[in-house]
Amino acid sequence: DGGVAAAVPFLFLNEAGAYIDTVLDTLKNDKPDAIVHDFAGIAGTIAADSLKVPNVMLYTSYPSNASYSVAAGFENVPADHPLRQAAAQLAQSYAEKYGCRLMTVKEIFDGHGDFNLVMMQKKLVPNYETFDDSFVFTGVQIGKRTAFGSWKAPDNGKPLLYSSLGTAFNNWPEYYPILFDAVRDLDINVFAALGSIDPASLKDIPANVEVGQMVPQLDILSQ
């Protein structure tokens, strides 16, 4: 049915449409010199095009160019898929209303800003040597993140495994029984970050596994 590849472009476009008018109304009264935004926040691109100011994109993940395409994973959806058609209609309406580029699937995931800051080490990016001077690889920018407290691994000398499903696609309760079965008999410590999953909903948590929702990730990773 297309699944994620069909849904994500539509969701990005729909989200942009929810607030782009408010953004433009605000910026028209105090026109900025440039617009800086996350590469997935396509309202930033729409606004920069509409106001005719430089578009500065921030990448906390992999950027694309002619030799490496993020969009490729989203393009193999039939053109007559309902969500692909809905996305195309939104993109066309934005181009007509705001005078912006046509936000195709290719443009959403592989489009560039006039200047691009990539928060990764250059050598971790596929084909990094093929990116031009409009891309600057700053390396990872990490704050102290003290809001979630601190954490110490059990003092038993065993290796520590940290499990986290990440930021975007993490509502997967079926994952945790699979994890628990995989690590139950291993002589290691495990910390599983749950995000929105209620710890009380999980059954038969192994003795070597600790779970938490909002966790001090940097503390855990440092150990």
Where in this protein do the model-derived segments appear?
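Short coil/turn linker and secondary-structure boundary residues
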Residues: C100-M103, I197, V215
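Nucleotide-sugar-dependent glycosyltransferase catalytic domains
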Residues: D1-L161, L165-I188
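Catalytic donor nucleotide-activated moiety binding site of glycosyltransferases and closely related
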Residues: T167, P177-Q213
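Short acidic alpha-helix that forms the nucleotide-activated donor recognition element
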Residues: P216-Q223
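Short acidic active-site motifs
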Residues: T22, V215-P216
